């Protein structure tokens, strides 16, 4: 979960070059310093951790979507699954007692507009509360402003729809303005209603590069740590994977 900053980072350095890897580390260090020195009300990881705890422990959400609006981060949701779920998926507190409150959430997601045609139906009109992190970038990597502007319009538009929704009155008014007959309005209007008031977090970054990626990953690590402290759990063990491995070892002998 956290090995990329140490010796395992050698493979990253070989892949992207040492100069880029150094920028990656510099970005992570900047977020480390921000987390250590910034006051709580301006501390990004702490504020996001508190928002997550509010959504989970007070609003009853048990899941979180990670939606980066760039295909370059298509593996980020999978990475954060391990980082968040293995770290905080615990039901025993630091004193060894059973916990009677919700801790680690189910983490999942996908990239940009692809996910809009995959699972956004459930987020918009389903009966489950699914807070989402929307990760966007102000500047395109390749200078294609037209494509990037379309991407960003979807980035903002989806969050606006989740926040504001659309009332029955608004739906009917729009259908009337399009000269749709009353029978069709009565038949279809309710299907077009969006409740809104769905929690989202907008994480807007200037441009995707090694430094900003280092800051982003470090930010999520500090969110994990902060939640673990508040929930009074050990975020850096993984007892939950042990039993399956022990049983698998015994079963392998029998299978062979």
Segments and roles (model prediction):
Residues 1-144, 196, 245-247, 252, ...:
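Active-site phosphate/pyrophosphate-binding segments
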Residues 31, 51-55, 80, 148-167, ...:
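Charged, low-complexity, helix-prone segments enriched in Lys/Glu/Asp/Gln
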Residues 55-56, 184, 215-217:
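Short, flexible segments with low predicted structural confidence
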Residues 102-207:
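Helicase-primase coupling helices
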Residues 1-26, 195-239:
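Short alpha-helices
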């Amino acid at each position: 979960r956290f090995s990329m900053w140490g010796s395992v980072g050698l493979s990253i350095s070989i892949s992207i070059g040492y100069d880029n890897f150094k920028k990656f580390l510099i970005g992570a260090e900047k977020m480390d310093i921000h987390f250590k020195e910034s006051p709580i009300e301006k501390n990004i990881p702490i504020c996001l951790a508190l928002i997550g705890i509010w959504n989970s422990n007070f609003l009853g959400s048990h899941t979180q979507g990670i939606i980066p609006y760039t295909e370059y981060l298509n593996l980020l949701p999978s990475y954060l699954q391990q980082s968040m779920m293995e770290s905080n998926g615990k039901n025993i507190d630091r004193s060894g007692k059973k916990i009677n409150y919700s801790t680690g959430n189910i983490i999942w997601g996908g990239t940009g507009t692809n996910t809009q045609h995959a699972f956004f139906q459930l987020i918009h009109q389903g009966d489950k509360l699914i807070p989402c992190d929307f990760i966007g970038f102000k500047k395109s990597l390749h200078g294609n402003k037209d494509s990037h502007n379309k991407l960003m319009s979807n980035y903002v538009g989806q969050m606006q729809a989740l926040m504001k929704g659309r009332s029955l009155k608004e739906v009917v008014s729009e259908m009337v303005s399009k000269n749709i007959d009353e029978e069709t309005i009565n038949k279809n209007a309710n299907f077009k209603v969006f409740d809104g008031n769905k929690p989202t977090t907008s994480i807007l970054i200037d441009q995707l590069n090694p430094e900003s990626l280092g800051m982003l990953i470090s930010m999520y690590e500090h969110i994990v740590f902060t939640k673990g402290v508040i929930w009074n759990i050990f975020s850096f063990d993984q007892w939950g994977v042990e039993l399956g491995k022990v049983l698998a070892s015994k079963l392998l002998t029998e299978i062979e």
